[in-house]
Amino acid sequence: MSVNYKSVIAMVDDALNLVEIVEEHPCPNGSEWVIYQYQRTSPLILSAWREGNKHHFVTKIGKEKLNLVPSLSAAGIEEVYIENNRVHIVYAGLAGGGVGAELRKGAKNVLEVNILEKGGGSRLGKAEVITPKMEKVIIGIDDTDTKEEGATWVLAHEIGLEVEKEGLGYYLDHTIVQLYPGNPNKTQNCVSIALSFAVYPEYKYKLDKFIKKLLKERSLSDETAMAVYYGLFPSKSMKLFALKAKKEMVKIEEAKSIALRNNIKIIPINGEGGIIGAVAALGLAEHHSLAPKLCEDIKL
Protein backbone atom coordinates (compact mmCIF):
# COMPACT_ATOMS: atom_id res chain seq x y z
CA MET A 1 0.00 0.00 0.00
CA SER A 2 1.42 3.41 -0.97
CA VAL A 3 1.23 6.39 1.36
CA ASN A 4 1.05 9.66 -0.55
CA TYR A 5 -0.26 13.16 -0.12
CA LYS A 6 -3.72 13.39 -1.68
CA SER A 7 -3.26 16.76 -3.39
CA VAL A 8 -0.94 19.77 -3.59
CA ILE A 9 -2.25 23.13 -4.79
CA ALA A 10 -0.26 26.36 -5.17
CA MET A 11 -2.13 29.66 -5.58
CA VAL A 12 -0.11 32.70 -6.63
CA ASP A 13 -0.81 36.35 -5.86
CA ASP A 14 1.34 38.19 -8.40
CA ALA A 15 0.65 41.60 -6.87
CA LEU A 16 1.88 40.54 -3.43
CA ASN A 17 4.55 38.14 -4.73
CA LEU A 18 3.18 35.45 -2.42
CA VAL A 19 2.05 31.85 -2.79
CA GLU A 20 -0.47 29.91 -0.71
CA ILE A 21 0.28 26.19 -0.76
CA VAL A 22 -2.52 23.82 0.28
CA GLU A 23 -1.57 20.18 0.83
CA GLU A 24 -3.91 17.34 1.68
CA HIS A 25 -1.96 15.14 4.10
CA PRO A 26 -2.33 11.33 3.98
CA CYS A 27 -3.21 11.03 7.69
CA PRO A 28 -6.87 11.55 8.71
CA ASN A 29 -6.27 14.77 10.62
CA GLY A 30 -3.04 15.94 9.04
CA SER A 31 0.09 16.66 11.05
CA GLU A 32 0.48 19.58 13.44
CA TRP A 33 4.15 18.56 13.70
CA VAL A 34 4.61 19.42 10.02
CA ILE A 35 2.95 22.83 10.50
CA TYR A 36 5.11 23.60 13.53
CA GLN A 37 8.39 22.38 12.06
CA TYR A 38 7.95 23.95 8.62
CA GLN A 39 7.10 27.35 10.05
CA ARG A 40 9.90 27.18 12.60
CA THR A 41 12.49 26.07 10.02
CA SER A 42 11.57 28.04 6.87
CA PRO A 43 12.28 31.79 6.54
CA LEU A 44 10.11 31.79 3.39
CA ILE A 45 6.97 30.78 5.31
CA LEU A 46 5.00 33.78 6.62
CA SER A 47 2.15 31.80 8.16
CA ALA A 48 0.98 28.20 8.43
CA TRP A 49 -2.10 26.46 9.76
CA ARG A 50 -4.02 23.20 9.56
CA GLU A 51 -7.69 22.57 8.77
CA GLY A 52 -8.34 18.88 9.28
CA ASN A 53 -5.85 17.10 7.05
CA LYS A 54 -5.25 20.18 4.88
CA HIS A 55 -2.03 22.08 5.52
CA HIS A 56 -1.81 25.73 4.46
CA PHE A 57 1.49 27.57 3.98
CA VAL A 58 1.73 31.20 2.86
CA THR A 59 5.21 31.73 1.46
CA LYS A 60 7.33 34.38 -0.16
CA ILE A 61 8.74 33.64 -3.61
CA GLY A 62 12.49 33.05 -3.42
CA LYS A 63 15.13 30.81 -1.90
CA GLU A 64 16.36 30.54 1.70
CA LYS A 65 18.79 27.82 2.78
CA LEU A 66 17.47 25.80 5.71
CA ASN A 67 19.52 25.22 8.83
CA LEU A 68 18.27 21.70 9.52
CA VAL A 69 18.74 20.37 13.06
CA PRO A 70 17.14 17.11 14.30
CA SER A 71 13.99 17.80 16.37
CA LEU A 72 14.62 21.55 16.49
CA SER A 73 14.36 22.46 12.79
CA ALA A 74 13.75 19.16 11.08
CA ALA A 75 11.94 20.02 7.83
CA GLY A 76 10.70 22.88 5.71
CA ILE A 77 10.38 24.65 2.37
CA GLU A 78 13.67 25.86 0.93
CA GLU A 79 12.60 27.45 -2.36
CA VAL A 80 9.48 28.61 -4.21
CA TYR A 81 9.64 29.95 -7.75
CA ILE A 82 7.42 30.27 -10.83
CA GLU A 83 8.43 29.34 -14.35
CA ASN A 84 6.23 28.89 -17.43
CA ASN A 85 2.99 28.99 -15.41
CA ARG A 86 4.27 26.28 -13.09
CA VAL A 87 5.04 26.60 -9.39
CA HIS A 88 8.23 24.88 -8.20
CA ILE A 89 8.42 24.05 -4.48
CA VAL A 90 11.61 22.60 -2.98
CA TYR A 91 11.10 20.68 0.28
CA ALA A 92 13.91 19.45 2.53
CA GLY A 93 14.00 17.51 5.77
CA LEU A 94 15.84 15.09 7.99
CA ALA A 95 14.77 11.47 8.51
CA GLY A 96 10.95 11.25 8.36
CA GLY A 97 10.76 14.91 7.39
CA GLY A 98 12.82 14.13 4.30
CA VAL A 99 10.75 11.08 3.39
CA GLY A 100 7.65 13.28 3.57
CA ALA A 101 9.07 15.48 0.81
CA GLU A 102 8.98 12.51 -1.57
CA LEU A 103 5.40 11.54 -0.76
CA ARG A 104 3.91 14.34 -2.85
CA LYS A 105 4.73 12.27 -5.94
CA GLY A 106 1.35 10.57 -6.20
CA ALA A 107 -0.70 13.62 -5.24
CA LYS A 108 -3.49 15.04 -7.37
CA ASN A 109 -2.54 18.25 -9.25
CA VAL A 110 1.20 17.48 -9.05
CA LEU A 111 2.80 17.56 -12.49
CA GLU A 112 6.24 16.32 -11.55
CA VAL A 113 8.43 15.45 -8.56
CA ASN A 114 12.21 15.52 -8.80
CA ILE A 115 14.07 13.73 -6.01
CA LEU A 116 17.14 15.85 -5.36
CA GLU A 117 18.40 13.85 -2.37
CA LYS A 118 16.99 10.52 -1.22
CA GLY A 119 15.91 10.72 2.42
CA GLY A 120 15.23 8.10 5.09
CA GLY A 121 16.89 6.94 8.27
CA SER A 122 19.03 9.84 9.47
CA ARG A 123 19.72 11.15 5.96
CA LEU A 124 18.69 14.45 4.40
CA GLY A 125 15.84 14.22 1.91
CA LYS A 126 15.11 16.89 -0.66
CA ALA A 127 12.51 17.00 -3.44
CA GLU A 128 11.20 19.53 -5.94
CA VAL A 129 7.43 19.43 -6.45
CA ILE A 130 5.97 21.10 -9.55
CA THR A 131 2.30 22.10 -9.79
CA PRO A 132 0.27 24.26 -12.17
CA LYS A 133 0.09 27.94 -11.26
CA MET A 134 -3.37 28.63 -9.80
CA GLU A 135 -5.14 31.64 -8.28
CA LYS A 136 -7.60 32.06 -5.43
CA VAL A 137 -11.15 33.26 -6.06
CA ILE A 138 -13.63 33.78 -3.21
CA ILE A 139 -17.36 33.92 -3.92
CA GLY A 140 -19.90 35.39 -1.48
CA ILE A 141 -23.50 34.21 -1.83
CA ASP A 142 -26.66 35.30 -0.01
CA ASP A 143 -30.42 35.10 -0.16
CA THR A 144 -31.15 31.95 -2.14
CA ASP A 145 -33.94 30.55 0.05
CA THR A 146 -37.43 31.53 1.22
CA LYS A 147 -39.23 31.14 4.54
CA GLU A 148 -40.88 28.03 3.11
CA GLU A 149 -37.99 26.16 1.49
CA GLY A 150 -34.30 26.02 0.65
CA ALA A 151 -31.03 26.60 2.51
CA THR A 152 -28.28 28.87 1.20
CA TRP A 153 -25.47 26.81 2.73
CA VAL A 154 -26.68 23.63 1.00
CA LEU A 155 -27.07 25.26 -2.42
CA ALA A 156 -23.64 26.91 -2.06
CA HIS A 157 -22.05 23.56 -1.24
CA GLU A 158 -23.71 21.94 -4.26
CA ILE A 159 -22.31 24.73 -6.42
CA GLY A 160 -18.81 24.20 -5.00
CA LEU A 161 -18.98 20.54 -5.95
CA GLU A 162 -20.24 21.42 -9.44
CA VAL A 163 -17.29 23.78 -9.99
CA GLU A 164 -14.82 21.00 -9.20
CA LYS A 165 -16.75 18.47 -11.29
CA GLU A 166 -16.65 20.91 -14.23
CA GLY A 167 -12.84 21.04 -13.96
CA LEU A 168 -12.61 24.80 -13.41
CA GLY A 169 -10.51 24.34 -10.28
CA TYR A 170 -10.59 23.01 -6.71
CA TYR A 171 -13.31 23.68 -4.14
CA LEU A 172 -11.26 24.59 -1.07
CA ASP A 173 -13.58 25.98 1.56
CA HIS A 174 -17.17 26.68 2.58
CA THR A 175 -17.61 29.29 5.34
CA ILE A 176 -20.95 30.07 6.97
CA VAL A 177 -20.95 33.72 8.11
CA GLN A 178 -23.41 34.74 10.82
CA LEU A 179 -24.97 38.16 10.17
CA TYR A 180 -27.15 40.48 12.29
CA PRO A 181 -29.96 38.35 13.80
CA GLY A 182 -32.24 41.38 14.14
CA ASN A 183 -32.51 41.84 10.37
CA PRO A 184 -36.25 41.99 9.58
CA ASN A 185 -35.58 40.73 6.04
CA LYS A 186 -33.95 37.45 7.10
CA THR A 187 -35.48 34.09 6.24
CA GLN A 188 -34.47 32.45 9.53
CA ASN A 189 -30.88 32.23 10.84
CA CYS A 190 -29.50 35.16 8.82
CA VAL A 191 -26.28 33.73 7.44
CA SER A 192 -24.41 34.15 4.16
CA ILE A 193 -21.81 31.89 2.56
CA ALA A 194 -18.26 32.31 1.28
CA LEU A 195 -16.86 29.70 -1.11
CA SER A 196 -13.11 29.60 -1.77
CA PHE A 197 -11.65 28.11 -4.94
CA ALA A 198 -8.23 27.49 -6.46
CA VAL A 199 -8.70 28.10 -10.18
CA TYR A 200 -6.54 27.82 -13.27
CA PRO A 201 -5.75 31.29 -14.68
CA GLU A 202 -7.62 30.61 -17.92
CA TYR A 203 -10.82 29.93 -15.93
CA LYS A 204 -10.45 32.84 -13.50
CA TYR A 205 -13.13 34.98 -15.16
CA LYS A 206 -15.29 32.06 -16.29
CA LEU A 207 -15.96 30.90 -12.74
CA ASP A 208 -18.41 33.68 -11.87
CA LYS A 209 -20.40 33.08 -15.07
CA PHE A 210 -20.68 29.38 -14.26
CA ILE A 211 -21.84 30.06 -10.69
CA LYS A 212 -24.24 32.81 -11.81
CA LYS A 213 -25.90 30.34 -14.19
CA LEU A 214 -26.33 27.74 -11.43
CA LEU A 215 -27.76 30.31 -9.01
CA LYS A 216 -30.16 31.56 -11.67
CA GLU A 217 -31.39 28.00 -12.21
CA ARG A 218 -31.56 26.86 -8.59
CA SER A 219 -32.21 29.85 -6.33
CA LEU A 220 -35.67 30.09 -4.80
CA SER A 221 -35.44 33.76 -3.82
CA ASP A 222 -36.12 36.97 -5.74
CA GLU A 223 -33.20 38.75 -4.02
CA THR A 224 -30.23 36.44 -4.70
CA ALA A 225 -26.84 38.08 -5.23
CA MET A 226 -23.20 37.08 -5.34
CA ALA A 227 -19.90 38.91 -4.90
CA VAL A 228 -16.48 37.91 -6.27
CA TYR A 229 -13.03 38.65 -4.82
CA TYR A 230 -9.78 37.76 -6.58
CA GLY A 231 -6.81 37.32 -4.23
CA LEU A 232 -5.36 35.39 -1.32
CA PHE A 233 -6.37 37.74 1.49
CA PRO A 234 -9.53 39.81 1.92
CA SER A 235 -8.60 43.30 3.16
CA LYS A 236 -9.00 44.82 6.61
CA SER A 237 -11.83 47.06 5.37
CA MET A 238 -13.69 43.97 4.11
CA LYS A 239 -13.31 42.30 7.51
CA LEU A 240 -14.52 45.41 9.36
CA PHE A 241 -17.57 45.62 7.10
CA ALA A 242 -18.39 41.97 7.81
CA LEU A 243 -18.11 42.56 11.56
CA LYS A 244 -20.40 45.58 11.27
CA ALA A 245 -22.93 43.45 9.37
CA LYS A 246 -22.95 41.08 12.36
CA LYS A 247 -23.69 43.93 14.76
CA GLU A 248 -26.34 46.04 13.01
CA MET A 249 -28.26 46.79 9.84
CA VAL A 250 -26.08 48.22 7.08
CA LYS A 251 -27.10 50.00 3.90
CA ILE A 252 -26.62 48.50 0.47
CA GLU A 253 -24.70 51.64 -0.54
CA GLU A 254 -22.06 50.82 2.07
CA ALA A 255 -21.67 47.30 0.68
CA LYS A 256 -21.26 48.74 -2.82
CA SER A 257 -18.67 51.24 -1.55
CA ILE A 258 -16.63 48.47 0.09
CA ALA A 259 -16.86 46.47 -3.14
CA LEU A 260 -15.64 49.41 -5.22
CA ARG A 261 -12.70 50.04 -2.88
CA ASN A 262 -11.59 46.39 -2.96
CA ASN A 263 -12.20 45.50 -6.62
CA ILE A 264 -15.05 43.19 -5.65
CA LYS A 265 -17.39 42.28 -8.48
CA ILE A 266 -21.06 42.42 -7.41
CA ILE A 267 -23.43 40.27 -9.46
CA PRO A 268 -27.17 40.55 -8.75
CA ILE A 269 -28.85 37.28 -9.76
CA ASN A 270 -32.54 37.87 -9.12
CA GLY A 271 -32.34 41.16 -7.23
CA GLU A 272 -30.13 43.22 -4.92
CA GLY A 273 -31.31 42.10 -1.48
CA GLY A 274 -28.46 39.60 -1.12
CA ILE A 275 -25.65 42.05 -1.95
CA ILE A 276 -24.95 43.04 1.67
CA GLY A 277 -24.62 39.45 2.87
CA ALA A 278 -22.59 38.38 -0.16
CA VAL A 279 -20.04 41.18 0.32
CA ALA A 280 -19.93 40.61 4.09
CA ALA A 281 -19.23 36.90 3.59
CA LEU A 282 -16.03 37.71 1.69
CA GLY A 283 -14.60 39.65 4.62
CA LEU A 284 -14.65 36.64 6.94
CA ALA A 285 -13.95 33.88 4.42
CA GLU A 286 -10.48 33.38 5.93
CA HIS A 287 -11.52 33.94 9.57
CA HIS A 288 -13.12 30.64 10.53
CA SER A 289 -13.22 31.31 14.26
CA LEU A 290 -15.02 34.66 13.79
CA ALA A 291 -17.37 33.79 10.93
CA PRO A 292 -19.96 31.73 12.87
CA LYS A 293 -20.06 33.90 15.99
CA LEU A 294 -22.66 36.38 17.13
CA CYS A 295 -21.38 39.91 17.66
CA GLU A 296 -21.54 39.70 21.47
CA ASP A 297 -19.24 36.67 21.50
CA ILE A 298 -16.44 38.36 19.55
CA LYS A 299 -13.61 39.97 21.51
CA LEU A 300 -11.38 42.14 19.32
From Swiss-Prot:
Disulfide pairings: none
Domain of life per record: Archaea
InterPro entries per record: Methan_mark_11, TiaS-like_TCKD
NCBIfam families documented for this protein: methan_mark_11
Protein name (record): Uncharacterized protein MJ0921
Species of origin: Methanocaldococcus jannaschii (strain ATCC 43067 / DSM 2661 / JAL-1 / JCM 10045 / NBRC 100440)
Lineage of producing organism: Archaea, Methanobacteriati, Methanobacteriota, Methanomada group, Methanococci
